[in-house]
């Protein structure tokens, strides 16, 4: 990986850091485990997801079915492992 590629990944990792540790955990897990092997479409969707503020992200994780953008819905569902959102059981 080039130095520029490494710097770009560091910037994306920094954008995964949020005001809530729960969001840090979810976003950083996806970034660390799946971002580098994701296809271009999923990378673009993840970067778009990072543009949202924390309250919107919380709503996305709570109910992914309500997300209008199919790319973001796919990333959220992949992070959660389902389309049903986070539920206490």
PLM regions and their residue ranges:
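Positively charged, polar, low-complexity stretches
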Residues: 2-89
């Amino acid at each position: 990986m080039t130095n520029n590629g490494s710097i770009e990944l560091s910037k994306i990792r920094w954008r995964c850091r949020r005001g809530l540790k729960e969001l840090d955990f979810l976003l950083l897990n996806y970034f660390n485990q799946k971002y580098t092997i994701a296809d271009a479409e999923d990378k673009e969707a993840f970067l778009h997801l990072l543009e949202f503020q924390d309250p919107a992200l919380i709503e996305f994780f709570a109910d992914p079915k309500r997300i209008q953008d199919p790319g973001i819905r796919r990333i959220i569902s992949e992070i959660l492992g389902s389309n049903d959102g986070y539920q206490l059981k």
